[in-house]
From Swiss-Prot:
Signal peptide: none annotated. The lineage of its organism: Bacteria, Pseudomonadati, Thermodesulfobacteriota, Desulfuromonadia, Geobacterales. Keywords: DNA-binding, Metal-binding, Nickel, Transcription, Transcription regulation. Its cofactor is Ni(2+). This is Putative nickel-responsive regulator.
């Protein structure tokens, strides 16, 4: 971490009370830690919106592996994007359903496109994309 700069802010007391409750609920030691995390999260969102920053993400999906050709389609899709798909975890939830978590790296636009394509495959019950910055921020 670089030099620490102290600064003050003006804030409505009701908003501050809500923020303090959030800090307590999330287990922060102090307001500064919480504010730093909020700033980092906002910077990551800005990078995601830009579309060209390098990001990492996970695509988590649940599907019934008995659906005809579904597992093959998902695997083929991963191979088509082998430069972006850097890891995969496959879990058998029960006799019919599987959970798959893919780790992807690339621009936010690329990752979003791959996730949309995977989650749009017929037979995928549900899924979610989580993106974050691949560039470490100072803590």
């Amino acid at each position: 971490m670089g030099d620490i700069t102290r600064f003050g802010i003006s804030i409505d007391s009701d908003l501050l009370d809500s923020f303090d409750r959030l800090i307590t609920r999330k287990g922060y030691q102090n307001r500064s830690e919480a504010i730093r995390d909020l700033i980092r999260a906002t910077i990551v969102e800005e990078k995601m919106d830009a579309g060209h920053e390098e990001m990492v993400g996970t695509v988590t999906m649940v599907y019934n592996h008995h659906v005809r050709d579904l597992a093959d389609k998902l695997t083929e899709h991963q191979h088509q994007h082998h430069h972006q798909v850097i890891s995969a975890l496959h879990v058998h939830l029960d006799a019919h359903n599987c959970l798959e978590v893919l780790v992807l790296k690339g621009s936010s636009a690329e990752i979003k496109q791959i996730a949309d394509e995977l989650l749009g495959v017929k037979g995928v019950k549900h899924g979610k994309l989580f993106l974050t910055s691949a560039t470490p921020e100072h803590h």
